[in-house]
């Protein structure tokens, strides 16, 4: 009880309603107000531009093609050594989306209760662009031994979206 009372006496004065409001303003309200001003400027020009971009991505998304995938046999067979670096390269035809695609390597592991968890997410870098063909590359290395699954995630990207979930 003495420890609890001491903790309340030492910590509680720092968590006031004023602090909560200050945190809210600095973390949320001010950022949202600035974003609104950007989107609403010039008769909502930026908002209309983003909406048109989203419609374009939706219209072309299913036509995106993976032209080639270059990875070593160990990755194809699932025999990855801990500590060894593997280079993975994908060439993707974005079908006119103009650098609107991002690619990630997602590594997962399964716990004893059968649940799958994300171990790491590594973004691919665009190393080359020829027309609509974008070459993505990542150097992948696992630092721990164990049983892992590797998959790839493709997603729409735009510097005007503050979060990936804003695409919806």
Residue ranges: model-predicted function:
Residues 1-102, 108, 158-161:
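C-terminal amphipathic helix plus adjacent low-complexity
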Residues 82, 144-145:
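Surface-exposed loops/turns
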Residues 88, 103, 136-138, 150:
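Hydrophobic residues positioned within well-ordered beta-strands of beta-sheet architectures
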Residues 115-130:
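Solvent-exposed serine/threonine-rich low-complexity stretches and specific carbohydrate-binding patches
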Residues 128-138:
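Aromatic sugar-binding surface patches on proteins
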Residues 140, 158-168:
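Short beta-strand elements
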Residues 145-157:
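Short, aromatic- and glycine-rich surface loops/edge beta-strands on solvent-exposed regions
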């Amino acid at each position: 009880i003495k420890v609890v009372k001491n903790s309340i006496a030492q910590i509680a004065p720092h968590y006031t309603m004023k602090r909560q409001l200050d945190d809210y303003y600095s973390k949320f309200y001010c950022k949202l107000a600035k974003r609104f001003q950007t989107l609403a400027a010039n008769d909502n020009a930026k908002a209309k531009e983003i909406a048109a971009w989203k419609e374009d991505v939706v219209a072309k998304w299913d036509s995106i093609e993976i032209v080639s995938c270059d990875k070593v046999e160990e990755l194809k067979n699932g025999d990855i050594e801990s500590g060894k670096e593997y280079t993975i390269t994908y060439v993707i035809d974005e079908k006119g989306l103009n650098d609107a695609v991002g690619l990630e390597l997602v590594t997962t592991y399964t716990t004893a209760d059968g649940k799958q968890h994300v171990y790491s997410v590594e973004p691919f870098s665009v190393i080359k662009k020829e027309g609509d063909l974008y070459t993505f590359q990542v150097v992948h290395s696992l630092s721990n031994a164990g049983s892992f699954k590797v998959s790839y995630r493709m997603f729409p990207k735009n510097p005007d979206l503050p979060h990936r979930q804003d695409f919806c």
